[in-house]
Each structure stands twice: as C-alpha cells, then as structure tokens.
Amino acid sequence: MLREASIKRIKELFWEFQNIRSGISYEILDDGVKFSIDGKERTLTGFDALTNNEMKSLIYKEFLKEGISLPWGILTGIKPLKLYAKADDKEAFKEKFFVSDEKFELMERTFKNQHLNFEPKYSLYIHIPFCKGICSYCSFYTNDITKKAYDFTKYIDTVIDEMKIESKIRDISEPDSIYIGGGTPSAIDKANTQRLLKYINENYKFKELTFECGRADTMEKELLDILDKYGVSRICINPQTMNEETLKRVHRNAGLDELYKVYELARGYDFDINMDLIIGLEGEKRDDYINSVKKLISMRPESITIHNLALKRRAVLAQNDFKLENIDLSKEIYAGLYEAGYEPYYMYRQKMTNSNLENVAFSLRGRASIYNVISMNDLTSIYAFGAGAVSKYIDKDNLERKFNYKDIDLYIKNVYNKDI
C-alpha cells in the first residue's frame, strides 16, 4: 500500500501534466499507478519499494516518450531553490529532476543574487489584514473595510501588545528586517499607522523596514510623510496590470493615472519601490502582459515581481469557475528584465498556477529585499504578529510554524494567553 505522502506527490505530478495537456487520466493503485495519455494506457507498479523521486521519475519518463515535458520536471515543491542550493553537483541535480534549460538558468541566476553580506539573525513580520475592497483573483485572508467597520485602534493596540509579550520571551530588539504586509497595510487610518511605526522605530533597530502599500488608491502624501519619518526603507506599489480595463474587471479601483501620480510622489522620498504584476488575469492576452512589463521597466522601480496567477478556492474567480489559460511568456518577459538590468533574487512556486510556472522577484543590483531573501530560503526564524500571521521557528534544519487566529476577534481575545 502506498504511503499517503507518495500518493500526494503522484497527484501533484499528474495535476501539472493535466494543467498543460488534455487527454490525460490516471488511477492510483495499491503499489503503483495506471494512466492514459491520449488513449494509450500504461501501468507502473512496484512503487512501494521506491522513493517519491524514483516514482515520479518513472512516470515522467513515460511522458517523455510521448514528447510531453514540464518546465520544472519532477520538482513539484514550493521552493525548488532550496534543493538546488543543497546539491553539490548542479548538473546532476538538473538531470535527476528533469529541469529544463530555461528553469535551470533561472535557478542559477537567482541563487547568485540572493547572498547577504551579513550573517542573518531573525526578522519580524506584522500582518494588517484589511483591504479597501477584495480583488477577484485574491485568495489571501483579509477583511473588506468597505463592507464592515473595524476598530483599527484596538487591532493595532493588540499587535503592539503581542510584540511586547514576545519581547518578554526572547530578545527581538535588533531584527535584520521588519515586513509590514497584508491585506493592504495602507488601508487603515494614518493615526494608527503612525502609532505602529512610532513603536517600531522606538523599540527596534533594523536594517530594512518594508511597508506594503499595495493599492494606489490608499496612498497619499500624508502617508508617505509618515513612512519616511519613521524609517521605512522599502514600499510596495502593486498595479498587478497596466491595463485600465483589466483593473476594472478584477475590482481594482485605482486607475493608471492615480498609479502614475502616486508613483511620482513616492519617488520624491528615499524609498526603494517594488511593483507587482500578475500573469494570467481574466481577459488579458500576450500583448497586455508584455506591455505591462515594458511600462514598469520604463518606470524603473528598484524591484519588479512577476507572479503567475494561482487560482485558489477563496478567490472570487475560482468560485465563478474561471479557467486558467496556459500562457507561458516567462522566457520573453525575463529576457526583457535582464536586458534592463534587473536580476532575479528570489523565487517560489504555487499549486494551481498558470502553466505550472513560478513567481520571481527581480531587482536592480544591490536592491534585493533582505526580508524576501531570508523568508524564501528559510534562513532564520521569523516572529510574526497580527491576525492570520504565521511565525517560523528555525533551528538548524528544523522548521516549526505557529499560526495566529485569522478571525480578528479571536486573535484579540487569545493573544494575551501567550505563555510568558
């Protein structure tokens, strides 16, 4: 009888094939798998004596016989670069996992660009789970402030108290980086934003402080003044697309004029700026994606992050039976970014994504985010605060996650029960 973990890996591999090609079906047996490719049936057995990678390799070779391959080969995990980093023989790694030349080059370039010039200790993450409307593609846990009133003062009070409680458990006064994410952190009122940043500024010494503004319609000069005053070094302004019609379609209310205005305003400060794009949004075609990338490159933010749409159950699109298109423009998009002086510095994969592709952050030389490098490679512990925040405790090769309550009322009620 196959182990549960083995069954999971087999399902993941077949899902990736089915996502790019019709005419594929399969049935998991007690000690193997029976599957069909365009009506040609195959049965592989003896899996109970094999490792997960050996099983996947046997299956993959059958697809290769039919001229069917995957860009990432049999690498089905979220963080393929962690396996790459551990491999002594990189070429043998490429062959073992059937990784394409293009993705192998991406791993090589990313790995070279993510080294820190200091020994990391730990970082902090603060979650602000509020948004000014919910985008149709979004599957993150957040709360729509246009549908319900929330007590931001009480929430920020609780986050600050949680940080104080954690400080009694361990010294967290000198993190490498602090990341304030969401949700849309800039969706809360400025007075509470200032209170949180003032507390951070007075109690922590850090190398990098990121504030994920996100939507242009939540940003204005008063907010940027506050961020600048309290030591924010990096902000995110995320258009997701540079197509006006798509912005309306995905319920993202800020238009391009507002985006350009906010971006120019932010350029008047000493912030590094990241901008996100999503490949696979409803109604967009090749020219839309290429045009969006070109527009961002012309704006010259310090970093550009390319996401491939992941269709999760929580998203409105998924609930409306939206189907992902297989659009692989990664080679063309990455080439344009390379030519413009951007290099990849972190990457990860998700399930249920457009063309089984990856999410990659590119930055200009020397402008990579410390937090992203640490987080994506699980280099150190990350102590997380706020509703829905997930802490990662890392001790050598051991990683343990601790999840805060997602429900805001439950979070506020239970945060004071921490063992101090």
Where are these regions (language model features)?
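Radical SAM enzyme core and accessory elements
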Residues: 1-77, 81, 86-88, 365-420
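A C-terminal junction/extension of Radical SAM enzymes
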Residues: 314, 318, 322-385
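N-terminal [4Fe-4S]-dependent radical SAM core
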Residues: 66-81, 86-125, 172
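Beta-strand scaffold of nucleotide-dependent catalytic cores
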Residues: 127, 236, 304-307, 372-373, ...
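Conserved acidic functional residues
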Residues: 84, 127-129, 276
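Conserved non-cysteine loop/helix-boundary elements of the Radical SAM core domain that shape
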Residues: 142-333
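Short beta-strand motif preference
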Residues: 33-35, 126, 235-237
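Canonical Radical SAM [4Fe-4S] cluster-binding loop centered on the CxxxCxxC motif
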Residues: 121-156
